[in-house]
Swiss-Prot record:
Keywords: Organic radical
Highest taxon of the lineage: Bacteria
Lineage: Bacteria, Pseudomonadati, Pseudomonadota, Gammaproteobacteria, Enterobacterales
SUPFAM superfamilies noted in UniProt: PFL-like glycyl radical enzymes
GO cellular component, one term: cytosol
Entry-linked InterPro entries: Auton_GlycylRad_Cofactor, Form_AcTrfase_GR_CS, Gly_radical, Glycyl_radical_cofactor_GrcA
Residue ranges of every copy of the Glycine radical domain listed in the record: 5-127
Entry function: Acts as a radical domain for damaged PFL and possibly other radical proteins.
Name of protein: Autonomous glycyl radical cofactor
Coiled-coil intervals: none
A Pfam entry, by short name: Gly_radical
Length: 127
């Protein structure tokens, strides 16, 4: 369990009024802020704090979402037939806009190779 504390009394003056997160499970303390002697984010053993008195402070945490690999999703709401028709008859679709790599782009402004790539990537039979 993680407990937030503010040190109110300590043998080490650098610890006075500093804020820490205590990890009872691992016997560690992470510095949130201190006037001097400790860096923000520094992790020390709980014993390294020595004799201290403290008051608990509420800790709010937001869930951390970690996505590795830079994943993203482009949503295009249309049919394969519409895109294939736009390749063959671009004059019928002058305003057809799609999402590619996070950008909105006119389908007709893409090269034929890029248009085929979009159709292939957008409409797959299976993963």
């Amino acid at each position: 369990m993680i407990t937030g504390i503010q040190i109110t009394k300590a043998d080490n003056d650098d610890l006075l009024h500093s804020f820490w997160l205590l990890d009872d499970e691992n016997g560690e303390a992470r510095c949130i802020c201190a006037k001097k002697g400790f860096e923000e984010g520094q992790v020390v053993s709980r014993d390294a704090l020595g004799n201290i008195e403290y008051r608990e402070v509420p800790v709010e945490s937001k869930p951390v979402v970690r996505v590795e690999g830079g994943q993203h999703l482009n949503v295009n709401v249309l049919s394969r037939e519409t895109l294939e028709d736009a390749v063959n008859n671009p004059e019928k679709y002058p305003q057809l806009t799609i999402r590619v790599s996070g950008y909105a782009v006119r389908f007709n402004s893409l090269t034929p190779e890029q248009q085929r790539d979009v159709i292939t990537r957008t409409f797959t039979e299976s993963l």
